[in-house]
Amino acid sequence: MIQVLLVIICLAVFPYQGSCIILESENVNDYEIVYPKKLTVLPTGAMNSPHPCCDPVTCKPKKGEHCISGPCCRNCKFINSGTICKKARGDDMNDYCTGTTPDCPRNPYKD
């Protein structure tokens, strides 16, 4: 299974306006960290379109939305508690969404 890394970078384009750019990559090393004032061309794979969950001024979830991205975030809302966010491999155990965060917390019953 190929996992896609979503990195959200908020750039201050103008004093009162920002933009949320999402970089998609299978490998974090595909992208370099750039300073917003020096960014002229987006890296390969970057999408410079408004993210439906992101307030472009604050680069936080829009009013009424819970999250922007993450394994437990879908359509700007937290995924229901108890939903598997990471399937077990081998002797491992499944990890589950909590319903209160976009992150996939480690199962507390794991060693």
Swiss-Prot record:
Domain (Disintegrin): residue spans on this chain: 47-111
Location(s), subcellular: Secreted
Main subcellular location: secreted
Sequence motif: Cell attachment site, positions: 89-91
Keyword Metal-binding carried by entry: no
Cited InterPro entries: Disintegrin_CS (IPR018358), Disintegrin_dom (IPR001762), Disintegrin_dom_sf (IPR036436)
Domain of life (superkingdom): Eukaryota
Keywords: Cell adhesion impairing toxin, Disulfide bond, Hemostasis impairing toxin, Platelet aggregation inhibiting toxin, Secreted, Signal, Toxin
Propeptide: 21-47
Entry GO CC: extracellular region
PANTHER family: ADAM A DISINTEGRIN AND METALLOPROTEASE DOMAIN, ADAM METALLOPROTEASE
Family the entry assigns: Belongs to the disintegrin family. Dimeric disintegrin subfamily.
Name of the protein in its database record: Disintegrin DS-AC
Organism ancestry: Eukaryota, Metazoa, Chordata, Craniata, Vertebrata
